[in-house]
Amino acid sequence: PSRFIAVQGMQVHLRDEGPRDDPLPIVLLHGTSASLHTWDGWAQQLSPKHRVIRVDLPAFGLTGPRPDADYSIAAYVRFVVALLDALQVTECALAGNSLGGQIAWNTALTHPQRVRKLVLVDAAGYPLLPESVPIGFQLARMPIVRDVMQYVLPRGLVQSSVRNVYGDPAKVTPELVDRYYDLSLRAGNRQ
């Protein structure tokens, strides 16, 4: 089941499943515009034998915005370490997708004593060809569009972005798009 815990002045949404005595919990970090639900399939497979911790990163899912509005990678790394501390996890296997991958590898680089294993799934953080960036992200980089998107976000744009990041288009169901869209509308999640 979901729960909220206090981390860095935020009420952080997470799911902590599997055996609590697992010596190496698996911590899963989602990508941009996503939520802990990104990892539903992984958690279902892993949680019978492993402690699996999934979290909605600040400004995504049900966690909401950071009080200081600092969304730098360094701030996300500090958040991950604070989360591990709050959950009394001294060492973990850390996995990240997209933005979560960039956060994971930076956490492993700056806090190697906290990350014994690292899994990167289509991690962000390296140079991309402009044409490989989904249209939603390209538009969000434009100052005027970014400002408008804080108030208006067409569902079709969300659907297009989700389709661009899923390897199997058949997995992009209307329900999945609705979840991405609905969570993107949460106050502070488009800052």
Enumerate the predicted regions with their spans:
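Active-site loop/oxyanion-hole signature of alpha/beta-hydrolase fold enzymes
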Residues: 3-17, 57-99
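Conserved HGGG/HGGXW glycine-rich cap/lid loop of the alpha/beta-hydrolase fold
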Residues: 10-11, 16-62
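Conserved alpha/beta-hydrolase catalytic His-Asp/Glu region
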Residues: 12, 131-135, 150-191
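Structural signature of beta-strand start/N-cap positions in the alpha/beta core
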Residues: 13, 25, 49-51, 88-93, ...
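Conserved alpha/beta-hydrolase "nucleophile elbow" surrounding the catalytic nucleophile
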Residues: 30-32, 92, 96-101, 105
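Short, hydrophobic alpha-helix immediately C-terminal to the catalytic nucleophile
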Residues: 40, 81, 105-109
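Flexible "cap/lid" loop of the alpha/beta hydrolase fold
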Residues: 66, 105, 109, 116-148
